[in-house]
Design a protein with these regions (language model features):
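N-terminal, positively charged/glycine-rich alpha-helical extensions of SAM-dependent methyltransferases
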Residues: 1-24
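A short glycine-rich, Lys/Arg-flanked "PGG" loop and its adjoining helix->strand segment in the class I
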Residues: 144-156
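Conserved class I S-adenosyl-L-methionine
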Residues: 54-63
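C-terminal alpha-helical "lid/dimerization" subdomain adjacent to the S-adenosyl-L-methionine
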Residues: 166-220
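Class I SAM-dependent methyltransferase SAM/SAH-binding core
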Residues: 58, 68-119
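Conserved alpha-helix/loop element of class I SAM-dependent methyltransferases that forms part
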Residues: 35-53
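A conserved beta-strand element that flanks and buttresses the S-adenosyl-L-methionine
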Residues: 130
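Conserved beta-strand signature within the Rossmann-like core of class I S-adenosyl-L-methionine
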Residues: 157-165
Length: 242
């Protein structure tokens, strides 16, 4: 049972990843994203194919560092580096705190967390780039630019693993999926008021495209080889290989 005080009561007009959101983020996404724990597990499991010796891994929009924490806990001997970027200083602080003990006892992986505007970062050559629920908050121009950076950054055979939210192909399916999603959040003990407030706060912050457009943007950036590994309601996960 999720305690009422663990939920996010959003009364602000615009959604922001501020200190209040960061502190309760892990609980909040588990309430708000279908199969979120499984999604994290799938993302980390997929990463095993691309964690090569002496390569760099990026987590764009790393939030509280949960994905990186799980990668650090993998039972592998590969030596590599991970950089986690987020535009929230509080998220970065929480990520460092969450992973500090693991990093201290782990000599094979170098980890660096940085608070930066992800739309303005430069990416070095890498073998794996992960992005969990960042892209819905990027407008079309930002998305195009970042996808091109990601493709250019990846080594040949390197991978981009992305989880995002999309629109349905038409209004009929969009209505059905939205209602199912609403019921899902109610089942996670979010109140109707909390769900409505969250939806209102995201009006000017979220930019969603349908699956066809997402594929088109991937291909325009250079990715021709990609596959979907998750889909539930309006949430998808895919892996694209350069």
């Amino acid at each position: 049972m999720v305690r009422k005080e663990d939920t996010l009561s959003l009364v602000e007009k615009t959604w922001r990843f501020d200190n209040k959101v960061a502190i309760k983020f892990d609980t909040h996404v588990n309430q708000s994203i279908p199969h979120y724990l499984d999604l994290q597990s799938y993302t980390v499991k997929l990463s095993e194919w691309f964690l090569k010796d002496n390569t760099l891994v990026y987590d764009l929009g790393c939030a509280t560092g949960e994905t990186i924490k799980q990668i650090l806990n993998l039972n592998i001997s590969t030596k590599f580096s991970i950089m986690g970027f987020d535009n929230s200083q509080k998220m970065i602080e929480l990520a460092k705190r969450k992973t500090s003990k693991i990093i201290k006892n782990n000599e094979r992986v170098k980890v660096d967390f940085q608070c930066k505007d992800i739309t303005k970062i430069n990416l070095k050559k890498s073998n794996l780039i992960i992005s969990v629920l960042l892209f819905p908050f990027l407008n079309l121009d930002q998305r195009k630019a970042l996808l091109k950076k990601i493709y250019k950054s990846l080594n040949s055979g390197g991978a981009f693993i992305c989880v995002e939210k999309i629109r349905a192909k038409n209004s009929y399916f969009e209505d059905i999926l939205n209602q199912m999603y609403f019921d899902f959040k109610l089942s996670k003990n979010l109140s109707e008021e909390e769900i409505l407030n969250k939806a209102k706060s995201l009006r000017s912050s979220m930019y969603l495209f349908d699956e066809k457009k997402s594929k088109s943007l991937l291909e325009s950036a250079g990715f021709k080889n990609y596959e979907f590994f998750f889909k539930c309601f309006n949430f998808i996960g895919y892996i694209a290989i350069r």
